[in-house]
Each structure stands twice: as structure tokens, then as C-alpha cells.
Amino acid sequence: MYQIFFFFLPLLHSYASAQTPPPFRNGDLVANFEPSLAVVTGVLAIMFALTFVLLVYAKCCHIDLRSGSGDRRRHDRRLRQGIFFNRSTASSDRFSGLDKTAIESLPLFRFSALKGSKQGLDCSVCLSKFESVEILRLLPKCRHAFHIGCIDQWLEQHATCPLCRDRVSMEEDSSVLTNGNSFRFLNQSEIREDSSLELYIEREEEEERIHREELSGSSRFSIGESFRKILKLGNKEKTLLDEHVNDKDEKKLMHKFNHRIVVSDVVFKNRWSNVSSSDLMFLNSEMVNSISSERFSSLDHVKRGDEEDQIGILRIKEEMEAKRMLENKLTSMTTMFSSENGDSGSKSRSVMIEPGRRSVSDITAVPRLSISIHGDCSGSAAETASALQNGGNETEERRRRLWLPIARKTAQWFANREKRSQINTTHQHFDV
């Protein structure tokens, strides 16, 4: 600003000296006044004012642009490193790091023990590739791994993951890997590759990330142009494009930072080493007991704890008992009737026929001949005896015809009811 002022000062002096009029009297000076000097002074003042305003504006805008470009460069660098920086959380997390004991309690593992596609995998803090002999520290909640020195230095000042910005909580992290032998393998004192646990890595493909960014709307015009180009291609170009796509599928690029390590505590290398023969015998006995219980007392297992179903089972059992009692009564009645008829027939036959003259047919209660005894009984007496015997047989047959259908229907009704109850219970068991 001062340089510009000193630059215009000689010009102003020379112009003023050139415009100085010859000495006049006081009256002539007032009469012959020319406003050229005032105009020049006003123009120069305006120029100086505009110059000053422009300098101030340029200085302020230059500071803002420089600070904005610096923030943008820092933001781009953090994005390249995979750290999504948040200004609101940066100030709060800067001095809210974890304790040293908490950091040292985080699990460790060797990079060579990791299974899966681990080629080109980098540490998102120092941007260097992992080596097979290096020991990495795992954040159990988000399952991201880093170098020990990198993550320890980071966690001293921040309580979040440098990759996904997820907060590291020791209470939640300790509950993730305390199932069985998981935390034992990942402990610092037992870092080895022959453990029963297996570590797998899940990585995001670079194509998926690009596709997700395209779907967000940032490159929708380029997508439309690429589709138009593909539609305009001929058969030869399409075949070349297909070959290029196939080669690209064979050589899929994995993202360097977006990964997730899965700890598998289910797949064991020596999973049968701790099983003894007594355990197998106990297992077999338990299987036999369960099968036998399911076979012989399936209703009890299905209806256990349900009072209504137990009452229904008791009712079925009572009905079965009543059915058995009815059948027993019917059989006893039939046997009684048959025995009474047999006794009456035998008595009549003993009166009619002498013991020495009885035949086989008389023993079987089917008399073929009606023989008079001692000639005292006439033919009418024999006819009356045979009529009595036939009448007893007819009453027995009538009773059988009357009771047997009733007993058969009753037994069939109880049997059908029992079958229906069993079918319903089995259907309920399968539905459960």
C-alpha cells in the first residue's frame, strides 16, 4: 500500500507544478479559478480508497482460501487412510483415550495365523503392509486389526477405532471373546499358530465400494454415458468387453482397509481329543433312554406340564379301564350262560340216557338220538325233553345276539376314540 502511495506521489507533484498559474492579483485569482486541481485530487482519493479496499479484501480472502485448501487436503488424506474424521468428536476424543492397562488387555494374534484373502492388507494408521511375522492387535467389537505400536499410540489419545470410528468399550469387548477358549488364544502370553481357534478375514471388494459410491449419486452421469457406450458397441467390441470383465473377475481387487476378522471358536482341529470312552457310553445310555422314553411314554413327554392334557390322558385311561371291565363282564356273562346251559343239558341227558349208553355226540351237547330209559318214558316225554333243550339253546343264542353287537360297538367306539386322541397328540407334538 505504501509503495503505491509513493508511486503516485511524484506524479501528483509534477502535475501540480505544471498546472500552477502565474502569479496574479487576489481579485484575478478568484475570478480565473479552474477546478482541474480539485478533480484530480478527488480522482486520486477515490483510487487510493479502492486500492485500499481491494488489498484488504484480497488479504482476507487469501487467508480463507488457504485455510479451506488446508482443511480439504487434510480431509482427503484422512479419507485415503480410511479415517473418517469428525470435527465434533475430534475435540472430545483427543484427550479421552484409554488407560494403558486397558490397551494392553486387548487381544493379540499373529498375521500368519489369519486365513483368507490377506494379500495387500495394510494398516490404516501407518499405511504399511502387514508382514506374516508381525503380531497385530485386534479390537474385538469392530474386529479390525492394527500394528501394536500404531494402535497403542492411537488409543492413548482416542477411545475409538481409527478405521470405523466405533467406540472401544472394554466391557463390551471383554464379553465378545470370553466364550470358552477364545480369549485364551488371543491372550498376549499364548500367541501361537497351532491353537484350536481359527481366524478368518472378511474383506470388501473394491468394485463394491465403487458401485456404492456410484449409487450415491456422485457419478450417475458417467454411469449413463458408460451404458450408452456399451449399447453402441458391436459384436466384436462386446466380446472384447466380456473377456475384459472375465479377466477382471479373476483378478478382483480387495479394499486395503475395509476388513473384518472373524474368530471361529466352533471349528476345532483336535475336537475329539478330550472325549473318553466313558463319555461315549454315557452318551449311548442317554440316547437309549431318550429313544425308549419317546417310544413308550410319548404322551407323557408331550403333555408334561400341561394340566388340561394330563386330565385328558387320565380320562382316556379311565375309559380304557371301563372298556376292559365291560369286556370282562361280557365274557363272564357268556361263560356263565354257557356253563349253565351245559349243566342243564348234562343233567337232562343223564336222566334220559344211562351213563353206559352215552355217545360222543351226547358228550358234546349235540344229541343225535333221543332214547327212552327203561321203556318207562313214552315218545311224548322224549319230545318234551328235546323241546326244553332246544328252548335253552334258543335263549342262549338270543342273549348272544343281543349282547355281542352292543359289546362290539362299545369296544369299537372306545378304540376309535383312543386312536383319535393319539393322532391328535402326535400332530400337536410335530407342530411344536
From Swiss-Prot:
Transmembrane residue ranges: 37-57
Gene this protein is translated from: ATL42
Enzyme class name: transferase
UniProt similarity note: Belongs to the RING-type zinc finger family. ATL subfamily.
Pathway terms, separated by semicolons: Protein modification; protein ubiquitination
Presence of keyword Zinc: yes
Name of this chain's protein: E3 ubiquitin-protein ligase ATL42
Domain notes: The RING-type zinc finger domain mediates binding to an E2 ubiquitin-conjugating enzyme.
Span of the signal peptide: 1-18
One Pfam family it belongs to: zf-RING_2
SUPFAM superfamilies: RING/U-box
GO annotation terms (biological process): protein ubiquitination
Annotated EC: 2.3.2.27
Species, as recorded: Arabidopsis thaliana
